[in-house]
Amino acid sequence: MRRYIIILLAVAMNNVAFSQKDANYNKIKRSYTVNSDGTIDYNYRKELKVISLRSFFSVYGETFIVYNPEFQKLKINESYTIRKDGSKVQTPANAFVEQLPSTCTNCQRYNGIREMVVVHTALEYDATIVLDYTITSTTADFSEVIDWVENAPVDSYEVSVTLPQGKKLYYDMQNSTAKPTVKGNTYTWNMKKLKQSAAEYYAPSQRELYPVLYLSTKSMSDEVPMDSQLNEYNSLINSLKVAGDKMKTAVAIRNYVANYINHNNIPLALVNNKVSTSVQTLSSGCGTTMDKAVLVRDMLIEAGFEASLNIPTTIRKSPNGDFATSDESNVMVSVVIDGKTYDMSPISTAEPVQCLKEKRISHFSNSTLELADTNIRVQTQIQVSNTKAKDVETLKLNVLDAENEYYSFGIPQCGINILPEYLTSKRSTPVVCGKTNESYSFNILLPENVKYIGQPVDIKYEKPFGSIEIKIFQKEDTLVVVRKLTINDEQISVKDYKAFRQMMIDWKNPNYTNIIFKYAK
């Protein structure tokens, strides 16, 4: 009995530990002051209470502040720890360490960017980290995106923007009805008791789930001009051309940039929103996502293609007028080939995607699977409509137990790729799955000495978001496998999550996706 009590206590304590939060922000404050002399002061303050051992050893023990001394100055205003007994411990001078950010390596142009690492000291259970710093930037325009969510709960979150006389602030709050308090030229937003971000697989982006505030003093964005000096690299561009094949030529140009120009994944704001010319990017062999996109575009144009940048841009409504926000980190290069427009990533060798087209697969085949001195014939019919559909894999037999002559035949799956093991029993966010319409039919002709090992399967049901059908049965010497799946929605709501999870468990069940045979000599 004593042993069972100890086990139960251990389980109970373990559950408490996992349900407890690691840390809690007592306060976060962001203040932006746009000065008339062309500088912007950004002040950040956080007061973070660390609760678990993991919080101060693995998660919150250091703060990383990235800035560019070329146009920014960093000043640490306060940095100390309030211990559980109320005593204050100042962060020592040797706990401030400057280093080159990992995203700036292998590019001499960005070697001046710095990352200040603040190592928080005197951490213990229920200690509070206090950090206050200011970054002063010399820049033309103010633009910022505030995500009102952290990896720990926040008791109080304040954002304020102060402008010089006559300057307009464009702003748009999404996923919240919070409005600013305006006093003179200062706009202030306050939020209380914010939940921490959810860490769940297949979840929508944070900006779909949590409040996000877009701020700008500029109404619209400008197009990045083409580099007229790129003709210096005509020999390189000509060497990448594939005679008689425009698609292969376009892909070869993109692949050159993706493979041989180092990608420095840093935000444009860190380089004062400056995009390098294509000659600068080529000659240095490195660049940001936007730099590489501009280079791909310009090389395609120089090679005779019609090409442009496809930057996700949203026109937003503000009390002071419309303004545009862009997501340069997800920029694509659009190229026209034989009258069709394709999007290409400038940082990877992913297959070009035809714009606004859903990938469809129609596959019909008669295959023969060789098994010792016996052949198994398979008639296959597959129809898949899915934006991320994969090509049909070659059918093959897998040896399960060679000694006892057991073999398996894996059913190809080309469409939805949601793994049930990542779907927890409870969920707080929608599931991003994408629409799909899949139909698979296999007629497997079994010789006399090959037996199907398994039970008949007959699953068929329908839910508001989609339907499923799985049938496995033997009709004389033919084993029939039918699989159909339809998902009508891009996302599955929390309300429908339980039913969707069960549907994915059924769809991916290895008993229904692997057909096992026994070969009798």
What spans do the regions from the language model cover?
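A sensor for short, sequence-defined functional sites
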Residues: 20-521
